[in-house]
């Protein structure tokens, strides 16, 4: 067992109800020097459903790009909206959206007993272990957009009020976290926040179901610390093992306030501080790397008028190139949907969005 990370390493069968025999199960990349990178853990999206249907312009919001609908009616074959009562849905069978790195082996590596990377093998090897804190059967429910009983709005022709459409994508997927990395001589463990100890993550919540809504009972985890041990000490002393080095992380939720997947009044998980300790000596805590961010929005009372670098969440806050664009700068109070063009009076403020992080003056040298 991991003396720091209480989560168990998960063993996953190569063939399950959704991991089919004909699916790719492992990818190996061979480098020019003979070293092999083994991506042996396929991470699955088990459900993906894309739905579009006729929608009512009267309950659409052009500013947010969302339209309300009646679940069980509008998003079914019983749709009666618009001129064509359109409803369409496409479901994609389970597929691997990522392959996680499970091992790096040298050109002369030999698996002595055929049981994967172990200490009795010949050659150099690094093994990556993963965990699923919520168990093998847990699937994270995701949806775009996340808002309950709302869909992404497509206005169609402005002169035709009967051709408006709504759409959403819903799915379920596996969630894996890195548990530990080990070589023959060293091991690094990755400790996640523990909700049972009140260490709650307040963003990245999932969806209640296909019709959306933030499910605050479905939180993800964040990385709390990384501990590096001598493997001999780790194996011999278990919980009494002393880490050679520990990396600590501290967060808040000050960026992207108002994102629907966060708790009320919170933004996205934001890295604020990193510090290192050695052999459980806490002196390094006095010399952390501190990350500072500009105030959130020039239009919010009390914020710095010269530092509007980090605005709140805006689902339509982008131009036709995908770059951030505040619709309040558009002529005649037009929305970005109606005026998707890049503003020609750009300034340093617009160019600096999300790049305003800087190290605090008192941070220690790297």
Spans of model-derived segments:
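Conserved catalytic cores of ATP-dependent inositol ring kinases
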Residues: 1-366
